[in-house]
Design a protein with these regions (language model features):
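Karyopherin-beta/Importin-beta family HEAT-repeat alpha-solenoid scaffold
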Residues: 1-270
Length: 270
């Protein structure tokens, strides 16, 4: 911990990075004791957060710090909740850093994904965190960024929904990206999981707003005889049907008939 703190003349960024990597390695061992680490938790989080915001340029350096924070979040679990707001507040400035080659942003997406997984379920005011996530996702799904950030962004989207008890407008609006993501085999399975979590939170609302476009995009996945992802949309459809009220099942059936989805499902059984 002494090496992790900023102390001019005693430590520098190189020493602090080595200390951060050592701390992550210690926290990741089976002998790590959560309660024994409790007296050092605040100092560790403050030091790592300060180092992360200190203008590190190398992606490996940023990754070392975010990895250390992720490991600590995993190991101390709910003890990390009080530090959630401060960690979330530093994300926008870091995300806005000049990063034309997208070398820093993957580490930030992984970090925020772990943050929402550990922090979001324990707060009532989830909308602000969801809005931050939506901003990161929208940027990540831009055509120039998607090949490098798309997979990590979808994981962040999934973890955010799985950790939420309600949908805010920014996350709902993101569903406009779903048909295009479903059309790409590398993203389709994760997008189906995202849809599953979404329909659990707001089954009727998303059915009426996005059902036609999303299920229209899923139909080719189900109907293609050699589709490698046929089960993912089937699971998503099943989840939605189970989540809907009886009164809304007719609307679901109409959408399945209006798209080729019902025919595709029957054809896949033959």
């Amino acid at each position: 911990m002494q090496l992790l703190r900023q102390a001019p003349g005693y430590t520098d960024a190189t020493i602090q990075l080595l200390a951060a990597r050592s701390l992550a390695a210690i926290a990741d061992t089976i002998t790590f004791e959560r309660h024994a680490f409790q007296p050092y938790l605040q100092d560790a989080v403050v030091a790592l957060a300060h180092l992360l915001q200190s203008g590190l340029e190398e992606p490996d350096s940023v990754r070392s710090i975010t990895h250390a924070l992720c490991v600590i979040m995993d190991r101390v679990d709910t003890d990390m909740v009080p530090y959630g707001p401060a960690l979330a507040d530093m994300v926008p400035k870091m995300w806005a850093r000049d990063d034309p080659q997208m070398r820093l942003k993957p580490s930030l997406l992984e970090f925020v994904s772990k943050l929402v997984e550990k922090y979001l379920p324990h707060i009532e005011a989830q909308a602000q965190m969801q809005a931050l996530v939506a901003r990161l996702l929208r940027d990540s799904f831009e055509p120039a960024a998607r090949p490098l950030l798309g997979h990590d962004a979808l994981l962040l989207w999934y973890h955010t929904l799985a950790s939420s008890y309600a949908l805010s407008a920014p996350l709902v609006e993101l569903l406009s990206c779903a048909p295009e993501l479903l059309a790409q085999p590398e993203y389709a399975p994760l997008m189906c999981r995202v849809w599953e979590e979404t329909v659990l939170l707001a089954p009727e609302d998303v059915l009426h707003a996005f059902g036609m476009s999303v299920y229209g995009a899923m139909a080719p996945m189900v109907g293609h005889p050699n589709s490698p992802v046929i089960m993912e949309p089937i699971f998503a459809i099943d989840m939605h049907v189970r989540a809907l009220s009886t009164a809304s099942l007719g609307a679901m059936a109409n959408i399945m008939r209006a798209t080729p989805l019902d025919e595709a499902i029957f054809a896949s059984l033959c």
